[in-house]
Amino acid sequence: MARKTKLEDYRNIGIMAHIDAGKTTTTERILFYTGVSHKIGEVHDGAATMDWMEQEQERGITITSAATTCFWKDKRINIIDTPGHVDFTIEVERSLRVLDGAVTVFDSVAGVEPQSETVWRQADKYRVPRMCFVNKMDRMGANFYRCVDMIVTRLGAVPLVTQLPIGSEAEFEGLIDLLKMQEIVWKDESLGAEFEYRDIRPELKEQADEYHAKMVELAVEMDDAVMEAYLEGNEPDEATLKKLIRKGTISRKFVPVLCGSAFKNKGVQPMLDAVVDFLPSPLEVERMQGIDPKTEEPDTRGASDDEPLSVLAFKIMNDPFVGSLTFCRIYSGVMTTGTGVLNSTKDNRERIGRMLQMHANHREDIKEAYAGDIVAVAGLKNTTTGDTLCDPLKPIILERMEFPEPVIEVAVEPKTKADQEKMGIALNRLAQEDPSFRVSVDQESGQTVIKGMGELHLDILVDRMRREFKVDANVGAPQVAYRETLTKRAEIDYTHKKQTGGSGQFARVKIVFEPGEPGSGFQFESKIVGGSVPKEYIPGVQKGVESVKDSGPLAGFPMIDFKATLMDGAYHDVDSSVMAFEIASRAAFREGAQQAGVKLLEPIMKVEVVTPEEYMGDVIGDLNSRRGQISGTEQRGIAQVIHANVPLANMFGYVNTLRSMSQGRAQYTMQFDHYEQVPQAVSDEVRAKLA
């Protein structure tokens, strides 16, 4: 089976936006006009094709990124739907990894919102070329020009305006195409499928000329020869302009800005044209960086069917009909059903069973997938999010994704005995799909604890457990994920001896325990020379410390940011074993922790509140009362932005306080920043609660 679409005709794009900016509606319209869905699904009725999980339909927010493929002007567009809520930024990051370009959707009334900035910064991190679509031009208070200003002031980007709106709010009837210098006006009765080009009306001519000139001036900077000709009075034609805008977009010198109203079916087709004209094909983005697992040397893969196979698994979903589906982006080579591949991240083999190409609501079985494709593979046993699949003879590990640590936890208990077993299965499935979600069982109380990125994140996971797996559970109040660490250095020399007829147990270890840098986690080093502890026993020493560090001596929280160095030891030819060294290092750690002293750490969140000026004093006062430290304030348009670091323990239920304090006008976002020592009074309180 040969490749159907040339690689240069692929566009792998994501649609990024703040909640409610109209991302799902925009995606729906794209699928409608590219001929995939026959009836437009409205998010308002909860029937959009992209939002295929029941919950998303109820909450009207998009949670899982479904990958959909469609065609426009003979180009294949693969759309990865990204979630827009801050609790799901991990999914956004993951989808940004596999995109080549993105369309950022803004609400023309709200402009650039906090979450849009978060997502924009993530897209900068992965160097994703993007364009902007200013949506909802038909709403009261729509203001395209203010939105363009905010792209400069809030995102620090350079907007290249390629369209102007004709009218706004109820008067919004179409756009001026600044490349063709013509109006595009839609016929209402044809659901936006029909539109016509007309001459620009006289009253808008002056403004159109002004913006056209600005656009040309920015575009010609991409090519010296065109620039010279332009300065001599020769204006570039439309085809040349498109080439220059494409070049500037892909090199991230500027972002094309378009406008429309997806809900009113206006502006979607020109946006699709812009995706094809300005966003890169897999051939135009940087080669994928990776590491050769055999040599640990850097290696790369380019978009070509002839290079060795390299594939990134970026999402796992459970499908009621097919079971577990792993969404994959093929960077190089060809993947065929029935063949074996290497999961280089975990160093084990996988067999490619069934491959599916996902359309908005149906799926098509395929036998081969080529470089640039995004496919879903059924039945992979050990592959999780972020793993690389590759040619076993030419292995590569594509750059690893970094997942933030979960900071909030709740205890969940099944309501009935029957739910008990189902809950275990459900939680494991969910943890497999979402690396920012962890499940653990408290050894002492036997309680199951789930950990995630925020209150909404955990709400949704519990909800999915109920719907998808039919598990009813009681959920405790959210708890803070405290940690413990050492306060100073301690050196422990410990000997473990046990003699009971026959062979006994013997191990002696001398270990230095010391505090590490913040964020360093747990480090283990062996400085054994001359074999005072044989090589094969050293992993036992490390394992011993690891087995007890998850339950600290102070209040039973995991210990972080410390280092254990094995300095010396002794063994016995008959009585020593890995087990004996494990027991010795465990006891040494307990003694060391006691001697070094242990302190309690709490997660500090980076909080950003955007509020109208008049509530600023109240907001700052309230943050201070939550043990918050204000790190700065800035003016953003008419609003004030307050940056603060606040302990997570004091942020529960903050959203309600903020709403009532600002009459619903202020919003906030928060993400984990670092761990910090807890004040003594709070530490005593936490320990008393646990006791």
UniProtKB/Swiss-Prot annotation:
Listed under GO biological process in this entry are: ribosome disassembly
Q: Where does this protein reside within or beyond the cell?
A: Cytoplasm
Binding residues for GTP, per the UniProt record?
Answer: 17-24, 81-85, 135-138
List GO terms (cellular component aspect): cytoplasm
Give the record's keywords alphabetically: Cytoplasm, Elongation factor, GTP-binding, Nucleotide-binding, Protein biosynthesis
GO MF annotation, one: translation elongation factor activity
Q: Does the keyword Protein biosynthesis apply?
A: yes
Question: Ranges for the tr-type G domain?
Answer: 8-283
Q: Which domain of life is it from?
A: Bacteria
Record keyword Transcription regulation present:
no
Q: What is this protein for, i.e. what is its function? A: Catalyzes the GTP-dependent ribosomal translocation step during translation elongation. During this step, the ribosome changes from the pre-translocational (PRE) to the post-translocational (POST) state as the newly formed A-site-bound peptidyl-tRNA and P-site-bound deacylated tRNA move to the P and E sites, respectively. Catalyzes the coordinated movement of the two tRNA molecules, the mRNA and conformational changes in the ribosome.
Read off the HAMAP family from this record. EF_G_EF_2_B (MF_00054_B)
Q: Could you tell me what this protein is called?
A: Elongation factor G
Organism expressing this protein natively: Parvibaculum lavamentivorans (strain DS-1 / DSM 13023 / NCIMB 13966)
Q: Which gene encodes it?
A: fusA
